[in-house]
């Protein structure tokens, strides 16, 4: 299994998908193995790359995995994070400029997951702090304080949005099991990170009491 992960999956991303011209990773490859350099770059894809190489480095300690994780982390923080309103854009063009600026909380959860795993692997304080910033974005703008749970999406400046779907194949409902699962996942990793690396926590950090409340 480790051989498949390292020499098939991770090696593929290292050898074929790093965008050395524009930064980060390519957004698409055809079924025939042809890179599409002009393809948009999605938040979820990049956050998953960040988590994957961060976790690989934490377990296997290979320097090239750390380099790939750092590449993904730096690209996300530089290009996907909205410097004006906070949160993360849904997608960028191939040059790293915002393309779809809506705030999909499913995607923001993935960025938290990736950043928190990078902080677990490296002890990087900035990654932890930026993960916490995104946590507070979700708590402020997605948490339904009246009925509970989390809404799906908002506009760039956190206003209500008519189309909350992740894709054309999804139902346009204000809440979904899918998004809730992918909020539990990063919140759990934040909790794990704070237990493993207490030196990173600050007075602003999420309280354990609040995280435990989500268990019920």
Regions of interest found by a model, annotated:
Residues 1-43, 63, 67-71, 75, ...:
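Low-complexity, Ser/Thr/Pro/Gly-enriched N-terminal "stalk/linker" regions
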Residues 22-41, 87-107, 149-176:
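Carbohydrate-binding/catalytic loop surfaces
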Residues 37-52, 102-113, 126, 174-185:
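Aromatic- and histidine-enriched alpha-helix N-cap/loop-to-helix transition segments
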Residues 48-63, 110-124, 182-197:
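Well-ordered alpha-helical scaffold segments within catalytic/enzyme domains
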Residues 61, 81-82, 123, 139-144, ...:
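Helix-capping and short linker residues that terminate individual alpha-solenoid repeat units
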Residues 102-154, 161:
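Internal, well-ordered domain-core segments that constitute the primary functional module
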Residues 199-208:
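Histidine/acidic residue-rich metal-binding segments in metalloenzymes
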Residues 209-216:
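Conserved small/polar residues in nucleotide/adenosyl-binding loops
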